[in-house]
């Protein structure tokens, strides 16, 4: 229930607490998306009321989650409803669930101009570096995704020159770091050849080193995006 969800987040000490919502499946008819959205609206209000009851002196924040499937009018209707509740920020849910990039961007391009500029705007469940850059370009501020760790466990490593699949035979004798433009712990201390060896031996250190690098790469990506926005050079 929304009340249990908020109580768990309060117990965990979550800095940003999310309302309980229903992620609309894809593809969904408009009637299905509307029914799911209305359920999420009811849960959003109950979550907010429970959060207020539990908040006490906590420094936490609560975000609403915008649903509505791939239907721009439903998204805007849901945004209007959530904006009437005193949330600290708004998240965009129900994307990165199997839709095409064009469908996703169409939803974002309809939704983002209507979102309050005074609130953080958080896109849930995205994504690749290109996905993130495209979403920032239309006004998204925050992201979360498991791709950095999930892909690392499978030997897919992000670099400034594209994805490196470390298990491939071409890296057997490659003594270079994963990414010569990276200063993370993995790149400073281990070669591609050694990390490939760890993966081939099913040694957990391999996935840990790949994870450290992928997370470092994404932190650097976001830092570069922030700097580009600050210096008015993002479009370059």
Residue ranges of model-derived segments:
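Hydrophobic alpha-helical packing residues
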Residues: 40-47, 82, 108-111, 218, ...
